[in-house]
Amino acid sequence: MPGVPLPFVVLLLLLLLAGTPAQPFPRDLAARSTVGLAATAAYPRFGGLRGDNGTARLGLDFQRMLRLNGTLLVAARDHIYAFDLRQDRGTLYPERHLTWEPQDRENCAMRGRRQDECHNYIRVLVPRDAETLLACGTNAFSPLCRTYQVGSLAQRGEQISGQARCPFDAKQSIVALFVDGSLYSATVADFQASDAVIYRSLSPGQAPLRSLKYSSRWLQEPHFVQVLPYGPYVYFFFREVAVELSALGKVLVARVARVCRNDRGGSPRVLERRWTSFLKVRLQCSVPGDSVFYFDVLEAVTPPQSLHGRPAVLALFGTQPNSIPGSAVCAFYLADVERSFEGPFAEPRGATWTPVPEDRVPQPRPGCCAGMGPAAGVVTSGDFPDETLLFAKEHPLLHGAVRPAGGRPLFTRTGTRLTQLAVDTGAGPRGNQTVLFLGAEDGRLLKVLAAAQHPGGTPGDSREPGDSGNSSARTLLLEEISLYDPGRCHSPRGAGVPSRVLGLELHPPGRELIVAFAGCLLRLPLSRCGRHGSCQGSCLAARDPYCVWLPSRGCVPFSEDLPSGFQQDVEGSLGISGTCQGAAEDSDEDGDLAHDLVPGICRSLHKVCVQAGIPRQLSTNPAALAHWDFFPFPTMQVLTSQNKPWDHLAGWNFVEKLRIYAGQSFKKVFGMAGNGGWRGHCGSSPGFDQKEREKKEFSFLSARIRR
């Protein structure tokens, strides 16, 4: 602005910024589609071996699962199950299993444990090499480990102690991973669960290495979530009671810690057989604003993913246990995680923790790897000066925190505790879409299309329902799926919240997801494209990266073998928002009439229901449902007219809707009146022939189906 003094411009800018309203807390996204239990009831599930009375009585007691190519290994109570995911997608039953029961249950009971606790809960299941895996179980509070063949599940070699490699109690956390032939594990190492440990063992020619014992500065009641290697380090993700916030009470915070892969422990004087490189820093997932809102309880962390072309991890966080329920997903670039370990150290000063002045930090800098960077002249970790080792022993915590990519969460949800996270960063025909699958404590699954733009970018204009107010206008809650059915998923005793999702495992080649509860496993497709039937508008407006519109076949799941010419509108650039009459609408919980696991069913059912023209008002208006609910439609005749085995679907809600609408149309065609439904009007008429009535009904509906 020529002629205007610079101070005036600065003052004007400050006034404008001061007048800018604070950014509101992100509103919950409205689900574009909800799928009820009636629609997911036919998904394959597994709750135990046929004839296994123990599992039938006690429940499956799922612990963890591991996918190795097309094989899914599931660890549970006293069993490991192997599922071949390349076989029939309409079933979920193990092709192999092994039984590993404890031998000393009496000693467990003498320690005051309940009978149902004195089993072998298999808590560790990690690949050791291409042919073998390590399994560790609680073994009635006396943990043991065994090596098994991946293919046959045959035991290899002798069993070894599981102490510090597996918890004593199934409720205690554990993460484990083989790196460079060594087992890195993080758990508790004693019966009382007072000795939390980060441990390296089974190293050829090396003594085991562990964290400092009984040190609240190192570990304070940790709950371990993930372990992964990256560069010269191994990273551990966990939550713990914050020692630096003890003045506020028992506050949980998320952490990421790291150790050097070449760490050999300290000198005989300081940190002998203890980590010399152990450092930890806070992991921060928060909503920015005048008053920052933190999600501190770390629940899940993905393996490294490619996010916007950069290595990153995505993590699921929740609010404090005594707080209002809420959850958030944040992404962290691994370069930012690495950089955070170069920050200042923290130490207590009275009731607060403050940064350590740089001139008080010894050299080589504590936490460095021997032979690298500032410690390039140090041959092994035992050669570090005592001053460096003593400082590392007393100062494991770094000041500050790792901030999320974009400065804010990718997705937030209030009123819900989300428990598990799986991520597909290669969704869509071009493999450039990121989809989050989030399991909840109440048994639901959320399917979220993450923002295509850089996280935390300026939200764009969007007129989609529920889009505004979140971290990005392009983040969409595609589906909200109800999965937990207490009548079909037997809950083990002491399972806590039986509806809590305990595990999610993606199987991209099969375009499916395995969902684990304490009492059962479910196998479901990544999409429900068939619910849109022959409605192009509904298919494209769904903005599901797994669904495409093919003129010759309708709305179908994308696969590499599809012919060219399909359409998709994930970005919403076409502005399509309408649906066709009869297509399953966004919030129609029973609109998912079938799914892609049973070939042929989906399209035939949509042909029946779409052409029957079930209007939305009948599916959502209780008065309309009550008005027409008594029409005695001959369900099996009509459904078998499609030459399909429909018997197992006879109780689905869509059949009731078909009865309702067919009854209304039938009444109009034959000029009948009355408000009691077909049965109320004619069912009691003297001399009415039941067979003749069914014949007319069948002929009428068949005509509607064929037209």
Language-model-detected regions and their locations in the chain:
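Membrane-proximal extracellular "stem/stalk" segments
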Residues: E512, C535-Q536, A542-P545, D586
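Extracellular Cys-Trp
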Residues: P545-P557, G575-G582, D588-G591, L597
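Charge-rich, intrinsically disordered regulatory segments
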Residues: V515-A516
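Short cysteine clusters
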Residues: C369, C539, C547
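Disulfide-stabilized extracellular ectodomains of secreted/luminal proteins, especially beta-rich
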Residues: P2-G510, C520-R523, R531, Q536, ...
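Short, intrinsically disordered, charge-balanced linker/junction segments flanking boundaries
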Residues: P5-F8, G591-K607
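Single-pass type I membrane-protein transmembrane alpha-helix
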Residues: P599, R603-R616, T620-A623
